[in-house]
Every structure is written in structure tokens, then in C-alpha cells.
Amino acid sequence: MLDYKREYERWLASDALNADEKAELQAIAGDEKEIESRFYGPLEFGTAGLRGTMKVGLHQMNVHVIRWATQGFADVIAAEGDEAKQKGVAICMDCRVNSMAFARAAAEVCAANGIRVRIFESLRPTPELSFAVRYYGW
């Protein structure tokens, strides 16, 4: 288990957070239960993907956790070699809150790792993403 207080302080001091995110974390200062619930450990990837409350924190759903999780996927793809990186990934978004921001963050991480990204420009149903995966040969 992480030292949640240390992790909270690390996030609070991070340049990666914008002013609103820092304010959100500053607002919970002194609320040990809330700090622990947000920082006791990383959000886990389950059978339905990443699921959590949209808040700032390591155990919450936010753009920083999306980037962190995507880096893990990027590492796996990169370990498979240049062919896997060239095949790349397909990313789409749905109508849920922050879906577009999360899709863009994931695309940025993949691209920064030299992985080809095909991202849909607008909302798409899951079967269309499944089709893209098959169509592009993944």
C-alpha cells in the first residue's frame, strides 16, 4: 500500500495539475478519509476497463490516471517491436463525461511513444471501434 499522505503531497506539488485540479486537492486538505480514498493506491484496470469517480487523485478517474494507464499499454506495444508500433491503436470516444479528453490524452501518450494512432473524430458506438480493430488487422 502506498503512503497516501506522501502521494497526496506529491500530486499537490505536481506541475502536471492545472489550477482547478490543485484547488480541488487543496480543498480536501485535512480531510484524512477523503485524501486516503483518493490516494491509497492506483485505480485498477478491471474487466470493464478503468472505472471510478471523476476526481483528482491516484484512485480516481482523471486525465492523469488515463495517461499513466495508457503508458503501460504503450510499453507493452513497444516491447512487441516496430511492427506493433506501426500497426498502432484505434481510439474512439463515447458520450460519457470527459470521454473526448480521455481519448485525446491516450492518443497523445501513444503518439509520444512512436505508436501510430487512429482516433475517431466524433462519438462512435463500440461496434464501430471493434470493426476498426479488425479492419486494420489487429
Q: Where are each of the predicted segments found?
A:
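N-terminal small/polar loop signature for handling phosphorylated ligands or for N-terminal nucleophile
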Residues: 90-138
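An N-terminal, well-structured beta->alpha segment
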Residues: 2-3, 8-106, 135
